[in-house]
Curated annotation (Swiss-Prot):
The keyword Secreted applies. Gene3D superfamilies: Alpha-1-antitrypsin, domain 1, Antithrombin, subunit I, domain 2. PANTHER family: ANTITHROMBIN-III, SERINE PROTEASE INHIBITOR, SERPIN. The gene is SERPINC1. Forms protease inhibiting heterodimer with TMPRSS7. This is Antithrombin-III.
Length: 465
């Protein structure tokens, strides 16, 4: 008998709880093993013997029309790291569309696709057979030129180094991974070593069998500490029980200051028009200045607001009045998004943007199953022999929880050099383009050089805290 966050299943198999977050929960280990690698960011592939129990080789795919016009890879960037970032963007848009389809058009949405992808990449370390194949396909890891699944982990380490070890500290972007394993279980040493070296996921033994509720509280407290208290109570009651073997958690925290701040004196109450035709009053921020902007297909406006340091930006996608945001969501593709971003040019703008705070919490299980990740969640079909020492095939993921938070105000964003242009009053805006986000819009927070989508969401009702 195992209980998960959704229901109860009768089976002889053991469960792993998966908690993406901004977080995720999965596996575990009992003893910690030191690796000779001193710094993963300067290591070479030969320095990190990634030898999981199973390796999947992606089949060769025929070139399709249009291939060969690839973007120029940024300088000093590993090609495979660039491809991994693109794979994450493909997964982000696909997962977002599945999630949006399951929600009401008036619901806010916010998530970190990078957090979800990272946590399931860690799961992939112990996967075999069709379970491994589905993980490679659903998360688009099979699009990376390096065709063997074991090398993905090395490229994830390099991607994390690019994102989280920046010399510029004007924005705060922090990620943390942790394994919480049942203290009675002995876990595969290779799995432990790779998890710690590549993902920085150290083991903390807990007593799931003897005190499941205290274990749940301990994990939730760790998550809260790593997100500055912004993410709490991710794991719901009864999600962990005596059948839980391991929980893997990934957290991402971002806090950034606008490169060009909004003056609080310019913030006024204005109406925001929701998808159902109703309106509500919201503090609307305002400023005039030069920003990267483009009006694209069917009048959709795309605006990029940089944070200090210019390496991380917020992208807003605002449909014209006559076009529902749901239509933009359904039509959006990774290539379309990349094309829009490439076309942005510096434009003198009048920006109206709501002051808002949104929080979202959901299970990712149903969406991932719809995308083809079925075996991992099946007690009968799951194959995760590379996690425990004895190579058992009785483990599966019972559920996967995700919780994310975003706050945007005059100073910047919390989720995260040129002259500041701020007008102390509202002018007549002659010869200026107006970007007025007084209706539902999409929001992305991305790392610019690699175009890595860190966060993604929909602001449908900023009046709800």
């Amino acid at each position: 008998m195992i209980s998960n966050g959704i229901g109860t299943v009768t089976t002889g198999k053991r469960s792993m709880c998966l908690f993406p977050l901004l977080l995720i929960g999965l596996w575990g280990c009992v003893t910690c093993h030191r690796s000779p690698v001193e710094d993963i960011c300067t290591a070479k592939p030969r320095d990190i013997p990634v030898n999981p129990m199973c390796i999947y080789r992606s089949p060769e795919k025929k070139a399709t029309e249009g291939e060969g016009s690839e973007q120029k890879i940024p300088g000093a960037t590993n090609r495979r790291v660039w491809e991994l970032s693109k794979a994450n963007s493909h997964f982000a848009t696909a997962f977002y569309q599945h999630l949006a389809d399951s929600k009401n058009n008036n619901d806010n949405i916010f998530l970190s696709p990078l957090s979800i992808s990272t946590a399931f990449a860690m799961t992939k370390l112990g996967a075999c057979n069709n379970t491994l194949k589905q993980l490679m396909e659903v998360f688009k890891f099979d699009t990376i030129s390096e065709k063997t699944s074991d090398q993905i982990h090395f490229f994830f380490a390099k991607l994390n180094c690019r994102l989280y070890r920046k010399a510029n500290k004007s924005s705060e972007l922090v990620s943390a991974n942790r394994l919480f394993g049942d203290k009675s279980i002995t876990f595969n040493e290779t799995y432990q070593d790779i998890s710690e070296v590549v993902y920085g996921a150290k083991l903390q033994p807990l007593d799931f069998k003897g005190n499941a509720e205290q274990s749940r509280l301990t994990i939730n407290q760790w998550i809260s500490n790593k997100t500055e208290g912004r993410i709490t109570d991710v794991i719901p009651p009864q999600a962990i029980d005596e059948f839980t073997v391991l929980v893997l958690v990934n957290t991402i925290y971002f806090k950034g200051l606008w490169k060009s701040k909004f003056s609080p004196e310019n913030t006024k109450k204005e109406l925001f028009y929701k998808a159902d035709g109703e309106s509500c009053s919201v503090p609307m921020m305002y400023q005039e200045g030069k920003f990267r902007y483009r009006r694209v297909a069917e009048g959709t406006q795309v605006l990029e607001l940089p944070f200090k340091g210019d390496d991380i930006t917020m992208v807003l996608i605002l449909p014209k009045l006559e076009k529902p945001l749901a239509k933009v969501e359904r039509e959006l593709t990774p290539d379309m998004l990349q094309e829009w971003l490439d076309e942005l040019t510096e434009t003198l703008l009048v920006v109206h943007m709501p002051h808002f705070r949104i929080e979202d919490s959901f299970s990712v299980k149903e969406q991932l199953q719809d995308m083809g990740l079925e075996d991992l969640f099946s007690p009968e079909k799951s194959r995760l022999p590379g996690i425990v020492a004895e190579g058992r095939n009785d483990l599966y993921v019972s559920d996967a929880f995700h919780k994310a938070f975003l706050e945007v105000n005059e100073e910047g964003s919390e989720a995260a050099a040129s002259t500041v242009i701020s007008i102390a009053g509202r002018s007549l805006n002659l010869n200026r383009v107006t970007f007025q986000a007084n209706r539902p819009f999409l929001v992305l927070i991305r790392e610019v050089a690699l175009n890595t989508i860190i966060f993604m969401g929909r602001v449908a009702n900023p009046c709800v805290n």
